[in-house]
């Protein structure tokens, strides 16, 4: 994943020093895109070890429509703890918007199920979009959606996905985001009897936090290794029926992990 390292270097070379909501400070670029051919390997960063358990469980948590950290904590995933209240609640974050977007008539819209249905029955639609950016509920969310919306595209028997991420912590968050949406694309493709195409990542405010500079410099000294392969061991009845045990990453040989503080 040379493109990931190239982005880090570009931010260091061309970025603007900016303040931010957390008070940490960043070096930031506006607007960047990367494309990953999912048939050529699973895009999991190899220049540091990524916590795959957290990536998989978080995605399953989103797909379940869950917005409480209890499931995550039960499975040893702590990535949302800093934002949860004393009861583990986060407000109507990703899972709620994906699965239960509130409509004007009082009903709710399951955007994920609608996306599956459209991919299967109307694959040429240009409206196969899932949005977490619900303006009317942003104030109720513990954290406004960073990966705000994504679109699916079907061509030549392949399913591609493009994500728009309005705000991106490149050192800590981006490896998770790329792997998570690549995994989702594989799952959706399997459910819809398609091959995988590309995952396209588009970032808005793309930044490195000022307290991640040493870690970034270390990572830039490392040479990327071959990408691993994702194996999905079974095809469940629906996109909502996958289990953690259904996934295996083969051939993942990363450099050692690099710890860094989370900006809250």
Swiss-Prot record:
Keyword Amino-acid biosynthesis: no
Keywords, ordered alphabetically: Cytoplasm, Methyltransferase, Nucleotide biosynthesis, Transferase
Enzyme Commission code(s) on record: 2.1.1.45
GO terms for MF: thymidylate synthase activity
Annotated active site: 146 (nucleophile)
Pfam families: Thymidylat_synt (PF00303)
Pathway where it operates: Pyrimidine metabolism; dTTP biosynthesis
Positions that bind dUMP: 21, 126-127, 166-169, 177, 207-209
Cystine pairs: none
Reactions catalysed according to its record: dUMP + (6R)-5,10-methylene-5,6,7,8-tetrahydrofolate = 7,8-dihydrofolate + dTMP
InterPro entries, A to Z: Thymidate_synth/dCMP_Mease (IPR045097), Thymidate_synth/dCMP_Mease_dom (IPR023451), Thymidate_synth/dCMP_Mease_sf (IPR036926), Thymidylate_synthase (IPR000398), Thymidylate_synthase_AS (IPR020940)
Any one GO BP annotation for this protein: dTTP biosynthetic process
Entries under Gene3D superfamilies matching the protein: Thymidylate synthase/dCMP hydroxymethylase domain
Subcellular location: Cytoplasm
Residues binding (6R)-5,10-methylene-5,6,7,8-tetrahydrofolate, per UniProt: 51, 169, 263
Main location: cytoplasm
The UniProt record lists the keyword Transferase: yes
GO (cellular component) term, any one: cytosol
Function: Catalyzes the reductive methylation of 2'-deoxyuridine-5'-monophosphate (dUMP) to 2'-deoxythymidine-5'-monophosphate (dTMP) while utilizing 5,10-methylenetetrahydrofolate (mTHF) as the methyl donor and reductant in the reaction, yielding dihydrofolate (DHF) as a by-product. This enzymatic reaction provides an intracellular de novo source of dTMP, an essential precursor for DNA biosynthesis.
Subunit structure: Homodimer.
Family: Belongs to the thymidylate synthase family. Bacterial-type ThyA subfamily.
Matching HAMAP family: Thymidy_synth_bact
Name under which the protein is recorded: Thymidylate synthase
Organism: Aeromonas hydrophila subsp. hydrophila (strain ATCC 7966 / DSM 30187 / BCRC 13018 / CCUG 14551 / JCM 1027 / KCTC 2358 / NCIMB 9240 / NCTC 8049)
